[in-house]
Curated annotation (Swiss-Prot):
Recorded family membership: Belongs to the methyltransferase superfamily.
Superkingdom in the source lineage: Eukaryota
Record-given protein name: Uncharacterized methyltransferase C977.03
Phylogenetic placement of the source organism: Eukaryota, Fungi, Dikarya, Ascomycota, Taphrinomycotina
Biological processes, Gene Ontology terms: methylation
Keywords: Methyltransferase, Transferase
InterPro entries: Methyltransf_25, SAM-dependent_MTases_sf
Function: Probable methyltransferase.
Length: 145
């Protein structure tokens, strides 16, 4: 993961849409405290099974990203690799609004989404521009793309 090599990640990490959980497990192996969430109960069960024999700093939770206000405390880093561009338009606002509950003023949000400039590839998927606009509407001040 290049973000590690670039020194962009900080202690407490949320991996949103964590299946297949390799990022969460990798970051935990490096000493980061990681919470991996996915809306899929099956994905979380598989992640827990994979890590049950490992001693690591990762916890997996089956959770809808729009309900992150249920978490206590804040995350220093949020990683969204392919989660946002696969949700419905009607879920954009709750998805991004939840970030304001879990991020503090120095938190970083990293997003990998389909580019809106290549419409033949993303079709119905949502791109980074929509994510950026939704974050601004929800007062998330810092955004790393």
């Amino acid at each position: 993961m290049n973000l590690v090599q670039l020194g962009k990640l900080h202690e407490n990490v949320l991996d949103a849409g964590c299946e297949p959980n390799r990022n969460a497990r990798y970051l935990a192996s490096l000493g980061y405290k990681v919470v991996g969430i996915d809306i899929s109960e099956r994905a979380i069960s598989k992640a827990i099974d994979k890590t049950s024999s490992e001693k690591s700093n990762v916890n997996f939770n089956q959770r809808d990203f729009s309900r992150l206000n249920e978490f206590k405390g804040h995350f220093d880093t949020v990683i969204d690799i392919g989660c946002f561009h696969s949700i419905l338009n009607s879920d954009h606002e709750p998805h991004t609004a939840s970030l304001s509950h879990i991020c503090h003023s120095d938190s970083s949000v990293f997003l990998r989404a389909f580019s809106e400039t290549n419409k033949s590839r993303y079709r119905r998927w949502q791109g980074h521009k929509r994510y950026s606009l939704a974050l601004k509407r929800n007062n998330v001040k810092k955004l790393s793309l």
